[in-house]
Each structure stands twice: as C-alpha cells, then as structure tokens.
C-alpha cells in the first residue's frame, strides 16, 4: 500500500523547480534593475581624468545608462572606476576603497595605465589594477575615447544582467584586509 511518504521526492522536486523558477525571475529582475542604477566611485589619479569628465558631459549622456551620478563615498557606490596610473604607494588606498564598497560591486579599469600600467613599465607603477582588485571590464586607450567608455559600460551591463542575483545573499562576512583578490 502506498504511503504519503512515497510522494515526497516528487513534491520536493516540484518545490525545488518552483523555487528555481522564482529565483530565475528574481535574478533577472534584480539584474535589470542593477544594470540601470550604477553608482560610480571615480578613483581618478592622472590625465585620463580629463576624458572621464568628457564622458560625464551632456554630449555623451551617461544618464541613459543609469550611470550618471558619481558618489564620493565608496559606501554609496557599487561601481569603482579606476581612472589613470596607480603607483605602488596608492595601491593600499585603492584596495581599501574597494573593500569599503558593499556587495554587489563591480570594477572598471579606465585606460591602459589602469589596465596594464601602460607605458609606465617601472618599479613605482602598478602593472594593472587587477593585481590589487578584481576587474570586470578593461577599457583600452590612452586616453580612451568617450565612445569606448560607453562601450565598456554596455559590456558591464551585459555582464551584470548575466550574473546570478539573490534577494538575500548569505555569504559569510569577509574579514577586512584578508579577502582574496578574485571573487
Ligand atoms: S592611459 Fe594615457 S591618458 Fe590615461 S592616465 Fe595613462 S598616460 Fe594618462
């Protein structure tokens, strides 16, 4: 005689399927919302800053990507844009700023100096900020044209939309200063 317990695996599977379906919808919705509400923290160190200001001007209209408003506190930002050359003395400061941004967060390397050290191939310059923080999008150029920056922002939006987003993320809290560089 069949008991109630015989049905449990099927019920569990259906519940898991439903949860997976709902999680997929939530993830898609959160991804859509997050990719259009990027609050950038510009970490500007060098000449690329002039081009960064151009991108922020009305002509290129960053607002249509939901990324117009810079935040000057990492606690209010979710997108760290590193603009320009980073030297070894600045490296711990950059890492500290990254750690102060709440999850979920993303990083863009703006220009060849931030991406790879550029032509400053010397002992004092960090040869790419991915040695200090994980980078989501690299924008080439010295300095990059505003169109390249917009292209980079759109690439980042695609990446955000494709990521898994949860309403509540139960990851253990990191110990400040001891997190690994990769995510
Ligand atoms: S990439 Fe070129 S413009 Fe940008 S900070 Fe380096 S040297 Fe300056």
Swiss-Prot record:
This protein's name: NADH-quinone oxidoreductase subunit B 2
Record flagged with keyword Ribonucleoprotein: no
Membrane topology type: Peripheral membrane protein
Subunit structure: NDH-1 is composed of 14 different subunits. Subunits NuoB, C, D, E, F, and G constitute the peripheral sector of the complex.
Organism listed in the record: Anaeromyxobacter sp. (strain Fw109-5)
Any GO MF annotation of the entry: NADH:ubiquinone reductase (non-electrogenic) activity
Listed GO biological process terms: aerobic respiration; electron transport coupled proton transport
First-listed, main subcellular location of the protein, grouped into a coarse class: membrane
């Amino acid at each position: 005689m069949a008991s109630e317990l015989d049905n449990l695996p099927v019920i569990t599977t259906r519940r898991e399927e439903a949860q997976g379906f709902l999680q997929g919808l939530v993830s898609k919705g959160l991804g859509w919302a997050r990719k259009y509400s990027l609050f950038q923290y510009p970490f500007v160190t060098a000449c690329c800053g002039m081009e960064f200001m151009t991108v922020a001007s009305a002509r290129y209209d960053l607002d249509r990507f939901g990324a117009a408003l810079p935040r000057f506190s990492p606690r209010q930002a979710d997108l760290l844009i590193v603009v320009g050359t980073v030297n070894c003395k600045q490296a711990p400061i950059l890492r500290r700023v990254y750690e102060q941004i709440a999850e979920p967060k993303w990083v863009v390397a703006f220009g060849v100096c931030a991406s790879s050290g550029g032509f400053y191939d010397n002992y004092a310059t960090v040869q790419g900020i991915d040695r200090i923080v994980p980078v989501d999008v690299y924008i080439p150029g010295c300095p990059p044209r505003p169109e390249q920056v917009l292209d980079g922002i759109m690439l980042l939006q695609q990446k955000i939309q494709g990521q898994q987003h949860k309403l509540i993320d139960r990851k253990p809290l990191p110990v400040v200063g001891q997190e690994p560089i990769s995510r």
